[in-house]
Every structure is written in structure tokens, then in C-alpha cells.
Amino acid sequence: MSVGAPRHILLTGFDPFDGDTVNPSGEVAKRLDGQMIGGCAVRTVILPVQHEAARAVVAPLLEAPGLVAVVHLGLAGGRARISLERVAVNVMDYSRPDAHGQVLCDVPCVEDGPAAHFSTLPLREMLAVLTADGIPAYVSNTAGTYLCNDISYTTLHALGRRGRSIPAGFIHLPFLPSMVSAHNLEQPSMDLPLMVRAIEIVLPLTVPAR
């Protein structure tokens, strides 16, 4: 980290996709943009739902002076709790088209990369504060094989190659109630203010001591 560079947390969410007009990950991230948490500014970036485009946005941000942590957010429709993702695997495999209409099968995130990268976020500490606050959450062992997993894997891979040992990882969020209602789904959901609160209380745990 450059001496004197303002310390900040990179917080990302995704654009809406799959016909939706809203994505809770992007909404949560936008609401926390600019907040000071643990003496660090939150810098929010909303990512396109296409793996190459999302990587192109994130890659230069990982080089930024003063970066102390990276927290990616995404949507996991059908899950009832905040999902603290433990691992990202080296594969993209999805039949749901991305924003460019692309589908992939058995494509590595990084050719010849390791099979998986583990989150370096303090997952157990995060789970403890969420549970104490009455927010449903758990440590998840699968982030899927869509864009969320890819951006988590490629971020952890890039940081490792650069020798930047900062906390980084991925958190999945449930549907918003409006999304369940709009599609007449029998699926769990979570209010936006509660999701904002969840991320707001875990971010301080990512800030390393000076």
C-alpha cells in the first residue's frame, strides 16, 4: 500500500439480469458507497453481468493504492439467508445466458489455475456478528458456477499473484420481496434495509489494523 493513500474497501454488486429490473447486490452496494467504515471509505462499483466485462472493471481496481479489502456481492435467488461464500472454483458452467447472451460449459476461469481459491474474508467472525444481530446467515460451500463464482475466483487469483494479502471474497444475497412478487415465486426473500444492515456490520471486520 502506498504511504498516504486513502484506505478504502472495494464493494461490488451486479447489474440486474435475467429479465429483472433490480439486483439486490447492486442496490446494497450503492447504498453503502462513500460511507466511512473502520476508518476506510467504501468505494462501490456495479459490475456488468458478463465475465470478461466484469473482470475488466475489477482488474485495475485491485491495483489501487490504499485498497484494504474486496467484498463482492451477488444474487442467489432461492436462498433464504445471507451466504458467506467459503470457496470459488475454477469453472464457468451455466445455461442461463449472461448479458451478452453467452452460455458456457466446463470453461476454466483461469487456464491452468488451481482448482479453487478460498475466501480470505473472516467468515466465522462475520457469521457471529450477523447472528448476534438477528440476521439469517450461514457459511456456504458453493458459490455456483456463474458470474459470481468467476469474479470471486479471478479476484482471489489476481491478488495472490500480486502478493496482496488482503481480505477478499464473496457474499450472496437473497431475492428482494418485490422480485418474488413480480414473478409470482414460491421463494424466500429479504428486505433491502436488512441486507444493507448485514453488509454494513460485516465490513468493519474486513479492515486490518494499522
Residue locations for each model-derived region?
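An accessory alpha-helical subdomain
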Residues: 169-178
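N-terminal catalytic or cofactor-binding beta/alpha core of small enzyme domains
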Residues: 1-145, 156-165, 185-210
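Short conserved micro-motifs at the rims of enzyme active sites and ligand-binding pockets
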Residues: 181-183
